[in-house]
Amino acid sequence: RGLGDVYKRQLLDAAKGGKLKKLKEVNKREIVEGVTPEYMERRIDLLLDYVKKHSPYYKKHPEWTKLEDFPVMTKGDFLEHYEEVLVENSKEQGNLYRLSTSGSTGTPFTVLCDGDKMNRVNMNFISCMELNGFRLGMKRGEFRAWIKGKNTISMWKSFKNNLIMVDISNMGDDSLEKICKDIEKKKIQVLVTYSSALTALTGYIRRTGRDISKWKVEMVFSMGEALPDATYE
């Protein structure tokens, strides 16, 4: 993020009691030190109890008492029962935010989050990045299927947040070469990418002998799946 934007957020947070700062500190401690099995079990029990009281889908199954009783649901299962799964008081939780997958595995998926959940998601991500050396002002490239008019951001917001949109809707050689050129030309320092896209990019570099000596990349964050060993090299 731009420094001005970050400082503004920090001042606003401090004025409201430093909630986000405390959340980030808790996240860092949990990432570094871990959490106890008792804590995890207590949190899971609270979550299961909540959905059994507030979700029409889970209300129908009072016999489900332990995590093992709850069925594993695919994205397709959730989509089929989407309105039932949503908790009844979701509309009472203020502004809701939509988090969507690109559908690269065949099934697009969207979840709704309230403001508190979005704060936790963002602080967890920032905590993980900072623990791995991320610094304020670093220019990051976010790899995703950027769709104009749907999830793209303005040039001003891109500049303000030091965020470069790296489109991965096409992963052919021409597109991969363009990604390589953009990383070099725009002096991107942090890559935030899905493992599948990173695997394709590293495969292209290895296969073509593409020169990356002028890249300014210091950090790579991979999401989604485990990376093949060859990708690390």
PLM segments and residue spans:
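Nucleotide 5′-phosphate-binding alpha/beta core
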Residues: 1, 5-100, 106-138, 185-192, ...
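Glycine-rich His-Gly loop
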Residues: 103, 145
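Conserved adenylate-forming
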Residues: 46, 146-233
